[in-house]
C-alpha cells in the first residue's frame, strides 16, 4: 500500500485513461445494462470517475457502493465503529447527481445517499422492492491482482460477500466481474482462500486478461 500511495497523480490519470479505454471495448461491458462501479480513493488505484460518466452517457444504469448505515446481523463493536458489515449498490440517476450529489466518507470515498432528492428510496441493485433487478457487471477495486483472477482487497471482505450475495440472488445469470489494476498493483500470485471470489477479467493499462 505504501508503494501505491507514492504513485504520482499524473501517472494514475494516464494509466486510468488507458484502463477505461480497454473496459469500454469489453464484450461484457457492451452487453451490460446494469453496471456497478467502485468510486476510487484519492490515491493508489485506478480512477473510475470517467468510466462512471461513460456508463451514464451510454444509457446504462450505474450503481455505486454505499458502506455506511447498512447493517446485516450482529457485528463486532470494532467493525460497527469502523464501518457496517456490508455494502449496497445504489443507483446514480444522472451526471448531475454523480458530480454534485455525493458525500465523502472518512476514507475519502464518495457515496450516494439512501434517498433521492424527492425523499423516495434510492434504487438498490439487489432489492426488488426499490426497483432493483440485479447486476450485469461489477467493476472491482483492490490492492493487488494476479493474471489468474486473484484479487487482494482492502481486508474487510465487502466485495467477496457482495459477490456471494449476487450469485445467490442471480444463480441463472451471475454478473460478470472485472477488476481494474494499475501496473504497480500486478503481482505474480495473490494468495486466496475459499471465501475469496476470483474475478473473470483483469484490465490493466496494457489490456484485458
Question: How should each PLM-predicted stretch be described?
Answer:
Residues 1-133:
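N-terminal active-site beta-alpha-beta segment that forms phosphate/nucleotide-binding
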Residues 2-6, 110-143, 147-150, 160-209:
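Surface-exposed, charge/polar-rich loops and edge strands
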Residues 15, 19, 158-159, 198:
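Internal, well-ordered alpha-helical segments in soluble enzyme and binding-protein domains
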Residues 46-53, 148-164:
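Short Gly/Thr/Asp-enriched flexible loops that form oxyanion-binding sites at enzyme active sites
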Amino acid at each position: 500500500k505504501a508503494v501505491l500511495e507514492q504513485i504520482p497523480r499524473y501517472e494514475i490519470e494516464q494509466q486510468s485513461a488507458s484502463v477505461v479505454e480497454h473496459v469500454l471495448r469489453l464484450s461484457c461491458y457492451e452487453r451490460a445494462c446494469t453496471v456497478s462501479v467502485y468510486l476510487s480513493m484519492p490515491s493508489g488505484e485506478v480512477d473510475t470517475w470517467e468510466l462512471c460518466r461513460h456508463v451514464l452517457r451510454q444509457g446504462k444504469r450505474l450503481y455505486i457502493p454505499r458502506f455506511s448505515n447498512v447493517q446485516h446481523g450482529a457485528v463486532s463493536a470494532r467493525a460497527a465503529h469502523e464501518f457496517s458489515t456490508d455494502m449496497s449498490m445504489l443507483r446514480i440517476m444522472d451526471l448531475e447527481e454523480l458530480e454534485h450529489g455525493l458525500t465523502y466518507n472518512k476514507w475519502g470515498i464518495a457515496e450516494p445517499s439512501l434517498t433521492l432528492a424527492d425523499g423516495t428510496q434510492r434504487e438498490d441493485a439487489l432489492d426488488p422492492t426499490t426497483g432493483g433487478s440485479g447486476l450485469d457487471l461489477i467493476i472491482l477495486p483492490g490492492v493487488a491482482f494476479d493474471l489468474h483472477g486473484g484479487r487482494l482487497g482492502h481486508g474487510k471482505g465487502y466485495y467477496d460477500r457482495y459477490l456471494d450475495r449476487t450469485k445467490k440472488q442471480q444463480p441463472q445469470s451471475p454478473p460478470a466481474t472485472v477488476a481494474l489494476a494499475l501496473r504497480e498493483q500486478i503481482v505474480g500470485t495473490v494468495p486466496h482462500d475459499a471465501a475469496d471470489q476470483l474475478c473473470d477479467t483483469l484490465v490493466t493499462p496494457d489490456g484485458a486478461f
